[in-house]
Amino acid sequence: MDSYSAPESTPSASSRPEDYFIGATPLQKRLESVRKQSSFILTPPRRKIPQCSQLQEDVDPQKVAFLLHKQWTLYSLTPLYKFSYSNLKEYSRLLNAFIVAEKQKGLAVEVGEDFNIKVIFSTLLGMKGTQRDPEAFLVQIVSKSQLPSENREGKVLWTGWFCCVFGDSLLETVSEDFTCLPLFLANGAESNTAIIGTWFQKTFDCYFSPLAINAFNLSWMAAMWTACKMDHYVATTEFLWSVPCSPQSLDISFAIHPEDAKALWDSVHKTPGEVTQEEVDLFMDCLYSHFHRHFKIHLSATRLVRVSTSVASAHTDGKIKILCHKYLIGVLAYLTELAIFQIE
């Protein structure tokens, strides 16, 4: 599997997304009020096993293919105020002008030496769990071709997409003035992500926050993705644990043939169509026991930081790579759940 590497840092400290995505908004105050009126939501003890994609017929196969096999950085996003799908062309123009202005100020915006770029907003029709979910949309920064041929496509410099899959718990808390797309995924330079995030925050009174994935949720991902029925496996099932030690940390990698991982899951799985917390714990305990039997190492004393399967791979620092279009909606549904939980 491809290893996850930290993005290169930029000289300017202000180029980091966390330096831009700060400050409370009126919507946050509204959500805080909702939190006080509702009980604390515990992690569900069971979840549905992801089924084959329920993408609608109007989904663009080329756009779906474009989203796969790329490493995305995850963010949660509060609802967008007064966002309109009918204004996507105008948003493209305004964001394009904003990026050029920021580049002229000397800020770290990685669009090349010239300003010959184009920002494109487009919908991702069918990329949702229910009819109630808002349509997902894609934002791209593309370098304009210097050639006269209009058919020549420019190089994609940065991509981000916004989605909501089975987001009922958040949709029920906000008014019609807000568009709820709690999950944001970005691919490209962090400096570009920061600039674009700043524009969205100023324009739609929203708030971005990096979405990390803790070891508990990685275990759920490992179980749910291992449970998925595959026509053929495209990747080894792999786990990566981090061992805190001085002077530097130590990583332990454990690779399993995907069919063996599925057989192990089937041996602990008792609830048809669902994954329970007990089954997740048993699945991971079996892996720990197997590893200890062969290598005399107690993995329970380490921290799970990455899970890789034929469905997707995820890292604790909020990086994900989706590999299988059949289970795209299932993967996004769980990520949406995590994003909503972070917002609430």
Swiss-Prot record:
Key word Isomerase present: no
Q: Which UniProt keywords apply?
A: Centromere, Chromosome, Nucleus, Phosphoprotein
What are the GO BP annotations of this UniProt entry?
Answer: chromosome segregation
Query: Where is the PTM Phosphothreonine found along the chain?
Result: T43
What is known about what this protein does? Component of the CENPA-CAD (nucleosome distal) complex, a complex recruited to centromeres which is involved in assembly of kinetochore proteins, mitotic progression and chromosome segregation. May be involved in incorporation of newly synthesized CENPA into centromeres via its interaction with the CENPA-NAC complex.
Question: Which PANTHER family does the UniProt record give?
Answer: CENTROMERE PROTEIN L (PTHR31740:SF2)
Q: Which family does it belong to?
A: Belongs to the CENP-L/IML3 family.
Protein name, UniProt field: Centromere protein L
